């Protein structure tokens, strides 16, 4: 499932390449025919992400909400979209543009030489401005958004007896952390024991964690990668991090901790695998 940084990259791509343009919308699969008809011919005015949700605003105060979930993906074709989502195959003959979408495409958006195909999303729906606003109220704080309020997130964390490792996965508290990478890594970097109850978390520790998380997510938006290690803890300390050096504990069960050398632990938590170091994470 894509983390928040990936959805922000998608929103940025739509904002840069589609905003201000009239869009032809269709549903080759047929499952979103009514929704596509509502969008067809409108101008895409804005694209924004909030956690794992992407909202695209069209002329007439009509909004499209997309949540990719586990299997959803966007495929793109057009200049300026390299490295964002997956690329559709460009037809050899210009007369064949846009290329045939295939039967699995829930929604196709075409504007000039740009094509975006959506397939397999968990959610894809058209909302009014009021419905979009009501939906966003239910979402937690997204560290990548300017309107994020870490104090509001802390109030929810500090009122709970649940473990931090569970609370950080809740999208109504912190929007955008959803798999076992950012959760595991930000807790490790803060040296926090993942079973520690939220009510035991001090405010200054939370603010340091929030700042670190925001920086890691911003790096992910910029590079398209999740890299949480410092150069001094990598085998190659100059240049981009190798794939095997990108994380401290995530997906490294049984391997030596990069800081203390003890084995990284793995256990189920919140329906996902939690990775952590019992030696380093004692706070």
Describe these PLM feature segments.
Residues 1-283:
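Structured catalytic/nucleic-acid-binding cores of DNA maintenance enzymes
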């Amino acid at each position: 499932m894509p983390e928040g940084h990936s959805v922000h990259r998608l929103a940025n791509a739509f904002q840069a390449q589609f905003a201000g343009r009239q869009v032809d919308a269709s549903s080759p699969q047929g499952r979103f025919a009514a929704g596509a008809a509502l969008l067809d011919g409108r101008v895409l005015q804005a694209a924004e992400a909030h956690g794992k949700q992407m909202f695209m605003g069209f002329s007439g105060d009509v909004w499209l909400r997309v949540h990719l979930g586990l299997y959803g993906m966007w495929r793109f074709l057009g200049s300026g979209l390299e490295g964002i989502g997956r690329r559709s195959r460009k037809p050899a003959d210009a007369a064949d543009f846009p290329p045939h979408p295939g039967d699995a495409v829930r929604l196709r958006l075409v504007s000039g030489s740009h094509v975006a195909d959506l397939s397999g999303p968990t959610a894809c729906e058209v909302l009014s401005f009021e419905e979009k606003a009501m939906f966003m109220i239910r979402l937690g704080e997204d560290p990548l958004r300017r309107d994020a309020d870490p104090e509001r997130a802390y109030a929810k964390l500090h009122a709970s007896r649940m473990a931090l490792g569970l609370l950080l996965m809740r999208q109504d508290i912190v929007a955008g952390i959803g798999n076992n990478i950012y959760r595991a890594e930000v807790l490790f970097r803060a040296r926090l024991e993942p079973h520690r109850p939220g009510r035991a978390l001090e405010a200054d520790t939370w603010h340091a964690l929030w700042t670190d998380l925001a920086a890691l997510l911003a790096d992910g938006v910029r590079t398209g990668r999740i890299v949480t290690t410092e150069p001094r803890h990598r085998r190659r300390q100059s240049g981009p991090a190798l794939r095997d050096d990108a994380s401290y504990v995530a997906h490294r069960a049984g391997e030596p901790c990069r800081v203390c050398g003890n084995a990284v632990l793995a256990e189920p938590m919140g329906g996902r695998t939690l990775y952590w170091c019992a030696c380093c994470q004692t706070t």
